[in-house]
């Protein structure tokens, strides 16, 4: 017999029992997609060992949902091959909003979707068992996939000692590390969304492919809710709203490099000002490092060897330079300008750095995927014993920042990869436990992604949920044991000896451009007052009211309220509609009555009207709304 733990309860099972055997002892086991066995994602068919700790995953868990969607991608590929046997499947990953699969030798349109969806439904109803198969070596794998050059390329690049697995359902077998659902049966609702052109490995010089996007759910009800969400997302598209609200534009002369307009810069500056205040109070010092630095620096950091294809490089006076794709190396150089003692730690250094990374043109998308952006990085230098407390400090900062925007989030801890890491086992264990303990103390929901950390340390990713329940990966907290060693950073420890510091690299907004895009969609362009590009628009009834309107606008501006006067020769109702379309928070109408009483007629963008408001009361109310960073109107 073996003994395992599940949900802090002990179970006794016969030798050779699987996670599925354990699941049979649980309620609602039909909902289980997979399992975390000793924090490793596994299939339910996995054989358990004595002492294992098991946690079952469902659709409601991010890892369980990914397993479900990955199986759905395989169902898509199987359905396509049943209908077009000559098609060549390439890759089919899970993405934020579902999954896609790329095919070569296939020509279809959305008119073919009903046939594919019907076949996918049939595959699910066949309740095909899904099993994991491990090939004996690369030669066997290459022989099996000999008619698919794309799979051959992927297999050839694998290390000789790699374990190569595939998943089989019915007649279909595909390369995959898994895990997968135990059968196709749980996929009750399956919908294809769109097709697009793609290139093998995203490289325009390689083969053209067709990409089919899809989504799947355990129930039809959830699918209907998701399709409604997609319709709502179209209304919130930041690219459309960015144009309509005159916030930013894109130019063909600089693909992937947005132009911010004056109204967009108001929001930008509000974000930056808030960030600076928050970090000053949290004990951060701000620096600025150059955008252009020599090849020698990037060789020390490792970027020249491992990231050069994503960097913009040039030669000046016969010396190679690169525009920085990341802020970290510049901060390392700043650290070395002074001697440091453990008494200074944690030493918190922040920078809003302007970085450039080459993205393929097909991957560019509004503010979400660009070639130039500003990253709100900070590097915290500390001793190993300080990691847990400082991580908790950062998590508290995360909570305050995202709470200010009304954004909920969850956290993901990525642990040590199986191979290719630096640092001792003891240091990895200490670092991982410190991050995990800080997450527990933060009392925010988090998941563990085993083996998904960087080679130089574990990390915490911050996944933000917007107003229509989409998630976006924004901030990150990365423990780095690599760069301090590469740059030979030192501090004097309590024994008076030189030691290498641990470094926490963290970003809260992540890309500020991307975060702004998320905010545009989250608020649907209806920004809270403190972020709004136009707080007040003053509307005159006739020309004789112009002087009073200008007087008020000047006064409000002096008080720190962004106010404009609509001088257009249009009706009052048209001016009001124009202001509401531009999502101006408050409109003030000046007519004969207001001129006489010196009081205000105020209208909100929600069309609530408040008459006879004194200038003093309105000003004080608006200033308090701005000061408090309120998400709702004060009037």
Curated annotation (Swiss-Prot):
Entry keywords, A to Z: Aminoacyl-tRNA synthetase, ATP-binding, Cytoplasm, Ligase, Metal-binding, Nucleotide-binding, Protein biosynthesis, RNA-binding, tRNA-binding, Zinc
GO biological process: threonyl-tRNA aminoacylation
Domain annotation TGS: ranges: 1-58
Enzyme Commission number(s) from the entry: 6.1.1.3
Coiled-coil residue windows: none
Short name of one Pfam family: tRNA_SAD
Reactions that this protein is recorded to catalyse: tRNA(Thr) + L-threonine + ATP = L-threonyl-tRNA(Thr) + AMP + diphosphate + H(+)
Presence of the UniProt keyword rRNA-binding in the record: no
Region of interest (Catalytic), residue spans: 237-528
Gene3D superfamilies to which the protein is assigned, alphabetical: 3.10.20.30, 3.30.54.20, Anticodon-binding domain, Bira Bifunctional Protein, Domain 2, Threonyl-trna Synthetase, Chain A, domain 2
Gene Ontology terms for molecular function: ATP binding; metal ion binding; threonine-tRNA ligase activity; tRNA binding
Known function: Catalyzes the attachment of threonine to tRNA(Thr) in a two-step reaction: L-threonine is first activated by ATP to form Thr-AMP and then transferred to the acceptor end of tRNA(Thr). Also edits incorrectly charged L-seryl-tRNA(Thr).
Subunit: Homodimer.
HAMAP family: Thr_tRNA_synth (MF_00184)
UniProt cross-references to PANTHER family, sorted A to Z: THREONINE--TRNA LIGASE, CHLOROPLASTIC_MITOCHONDRIAL 2, THREONINE-TRNA LIGASE
Name the record gives this protein: Threonine--tRNA ligase
Classification of source organism: Bacteria, Pseudomonadati, Chlamydiota, Chlamydiia, Chlamydiales
